[in-house]
């Protein structure tokens, strides 16, 4: 369990790995757990802020689930001041930072050094793996340079995975990659490539996203709060409810009695999970895996 406010940074020097989508999806996941969230958009494209403005035009701003702030990460002093301010704000539980897909910005160093958790999404492909390995090596050298000041836990996420793609030699490389990356942090289960995982909203969550990310996000959530149950009771209303934005797929469920979701395990198999995150028949022994 980490003392809040907790800073979680989504980062990789390789673009196109789903970093921004995972950041927003995790924000929606945390809101459903009663967590007070602020999202800091430091990506050069500012996709999250653009999405928030679009969402406000579409849904209004009466019930925004969390604030989105936009910053340019080029100023080292400004970023240092920002993370210090966020770490001392009692009104915030978790800060999510979407960093740029580049290491050129000078303000990234104080962000990485002061993060409690760094989430590194990547693809199993011959272009992304070397770039991600280089980024992990950069973080490791930064940790050695600053010493105990950098305490970030690393969660390395194989994102947008397609089990149908890859020659036998490549699949062997994927396994070796997982083993190598585990020397730098915790390599989570795979998040599959699905259309729902390539779009996001800063106001309305997607039920279909939950099934793909819950097992991975539960691990990160547990590392922060030491449990998988909500930190506080929160009644989501209107657009904040996890109704699928696609009316052909979305299903309204009995929210007064709790919601049962379909989650994906590491092998891509589906299983029912209660709103708290664990499957209904999880044993005490299995629960210890979150520790």
Outline where the language-model segments fall:
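P-loop/Walker-type NTP enzyme "switch/lid" segment
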Residues: 2, 11-13, 17, 28-102, ...
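Conserved beta-strand position immediately N-terminal to the Walker
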Residues: 8
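Hydrophobic positions on the alpha1 helix immediately C-terminal to the Walker A/P-loop
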Residues: 22
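Structural beta-sheet core signal
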Residues: 39, 97, 120, 156-158
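Inter-motif core of Ras-like GTPase G domains
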Residues: 107-126
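Conserved C-terminal guanine-recognition region of P-loop GTPase G domains, centered on the G4
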Residues: 132-145
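Beta-strand-loop-alpha "switch" segments that mediate conformational coupling across diverse proteins
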Residues: 160-207
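Long, low-complexity, intrinsically disordered segments
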Residues: 256-291
């Amino acid at each position: 369990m980490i003392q809040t406010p907790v800073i979680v940074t989504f980062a990789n020097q390789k673009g196109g790995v789903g970093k921004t989508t995972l950041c927003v999806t995790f924000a929606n996941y945390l809101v459903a757990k009663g967590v007070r969230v602020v999202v800091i958009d430091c990506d050069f494209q500012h996709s999250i802020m653009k999405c928030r403005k679009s969402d406000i035009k579409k849904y209004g701003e009466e019930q925004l689930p969390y604030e989105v702030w936009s910053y340019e990460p080029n100023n080292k002093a400004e970023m240092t001041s920002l993370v210090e301010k966020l770490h001392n704000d009692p009104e915030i539980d978790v800060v999510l930072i979407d960093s740029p897909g580049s290491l050129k910005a000078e303000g990234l160093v104080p962000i990485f050094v002061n993060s409690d958790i760094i989430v590194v999404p990547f693809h199993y492909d011959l272009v992304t793996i070397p770039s991600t390995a280089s980024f992990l090596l950069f973080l490791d050298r930064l940790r050695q340079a600053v010493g105990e000041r950098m305490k970030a836990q690393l969660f390395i996420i194989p994102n947008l995975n397609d089990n149908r793609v890859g020659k036998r030699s490549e699949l062997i490389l994927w396994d070796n990659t997982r083993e190598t990356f585990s020397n730098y942090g915790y390599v989570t289960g795979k998040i599959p490539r699905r259309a729902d995982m390539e779009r996001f909203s800063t106001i309305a969550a997607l039920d279909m996203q939950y099934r793909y990310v819950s097992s991975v996000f539960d691990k990160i959530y547990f590392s922060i709060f030491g449990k998988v149950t909500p930190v506080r009771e929160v009644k989501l209303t209107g657009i904040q409810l996890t109704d699928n934005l696609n009316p052909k797929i979305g299903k309204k469920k009995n929210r007064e009695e709790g919601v049962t979701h379909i989650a994906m395990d590491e092998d891509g198999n589906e299983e029912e999970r209660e709103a708290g995150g664990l499957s209904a028949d999880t044993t005490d022994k299995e629960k210890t895996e979150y520790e």
